[in-house]
A protein has these predicted regions:
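Short loop/turn segments that flank or connect secondary-structure elements
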Residues: 1-215
Length: 215
């Protein structure tokens, strides 16, 4: 569907709120990718990985904090502390044209299909806060979601993305399966000399480390 004719919340978000989730602000990052996402997009577009994948090295402590904050990505950093994300150019995702994504829905990253929903240990929550009105959201300067502002119930919010609870649960299960299979080596990623998350966790769990923290 042409972006000009699509009046879904996603198509109207940038116009109503000033920017969309595909247009990161200062210090913000686009969707986290799994190796499965990368291969699916590469196969569909023919693009080289470097054209749409950004590699963000994290310290071990940052990687541990990321997984603690986002349970859906638990295990993502088990072999490396490099986060793979969608690349932004000129303030927007490389796949954003006008108000729409050029990737077919079946090709898009699982994180994009899930947004604004965030997996938790016991279900899901919203990844963004609600301001209470579209006008307040537009003035906040913070990441917001037009669908979340317009929805009057959780069910209504799900329906605005053509989802129900079962469909959302299936997407969450898909994300967890892809995280479990991540990462597969990318040609452009070189092994880091930094500590692995697993090594940091083992070190923190050692009696010597526990004694040091008590001092």
């Amino acid at each position: 569907m042409a972006a000009g004719k699509d009046r879904s919340p996603c198509a109207r978000c940038a116009e109503a709120l000033g920017r969309s989730c595909c247009q990161p602000g200062p210090g913000e990052r686009l969707a986290t990718l799994t190796a499965t996402d990368v291969e699916r997009i590469r196969a569909a577009t023919g693009w080289r990985r470097e054209r749409f994948v950004e590699h963000e090295p994290l310290a071990s402590e940052e990687a541990l904090a990321y997984e603690a904050r986002r349970p859906g990505y638990r295990g993502y950093f088990r072999t490396t502390t490099v986060r793979w994300g969608l690349r932004a150019e000129r303030g927007a995702c490389v796949f954003l044209v006008g108000h729409g994504c050029t990737l077919p829905p079946g090709t898009r990253p699982t994180a994009c299909l899930l947004y604004p929903f965030e997996p938790t240990d016991h279900g899901w929550t919203l990844a963004v806060e609600r301001s209470g009105s579209v006008e307040l959201a537009a003035r906040s300067g913070e990441p917001r979601c037009l669908a979340a502002e317009e929805a009057r119930s959780r069910g209504g919010l799900l329906r605005s993305f053509a989802l129900d609870v079962e469909g959302l649960t299936a997407l969450i299960d898909r994300l967890r399966a892809e995280v479990k299979a991540h990462p597969q080596p990318l040609d452009s990623v070189k092994p880091r000399a930094a500590r692995f998350v697993g090594e940091a966790a083992e070190r923190d769990a050692s009696p010597r480390s526990r004694r040091a923290r008590l001092r």
